């Protein structure tokens, strides 16, 4: 469209043919937009009740999983299998080695150290022959060295 046609259309108005084309096109655009709006609206079903699974800041009802620390008193090396399962399942474990001899204790500590390293956990001595093993989701605060007397 040239400059002279634009000026004449501006002064004289738009010819009827072009006016009706624009109106027709805008009606199609409007009907397309309403279809999109209708498609994005959820269907209403009066028999169903919908509850939000997301908790809001104002109404925070969070359900927390109960955390437990398991206590084990192994007497043989094969008892360590259950300790390892607990750590792999995200549970903290206190292991009391009072029933084991020194060689067995070293084997178990080596095994647990490797397991704790694999799950990015932590292992600390909290007493004579007593160790705390925690997986990644536990945080130990404070200094436990005062419990051991070291």
Curated annotation (Swiss-Prot):
GO terms for biological process: division septum assembly; FtsZ-dependent cytokinesis. Residues 26-37, 48-61 have a biased composition (Polar residues). It is found in: Cytoplasm. Homodimer. Interacts with FtsZ. The keyword Cell division applies. Residues 38-47 have a biased composition (Basic and acidic residues). One of its GO terms (cellular component) is cytoplasm. This is Cell division protein SepF. Keywords: Cell cycle, Cell division, Cytoplasm, Septation. Belongs to the SepF family. It holds the Pfam family SepF. The lineage of its organism: Bacteria, Bacillati, Bacillota, Bacilli, Lactobacillales. Cell division protein that is part of the divisome complex and is recruited early to the Z-ring. Probably stimulates Z-ring formation, perhaps through the cross-linking of FtsZ protofilaments. Its function overlaps with FtsA. It comes from Ligilactobacillus salivarius (strain UCC118) (Lactobacillus salivarius). Residues 22-61 are annotated as: Disordered.
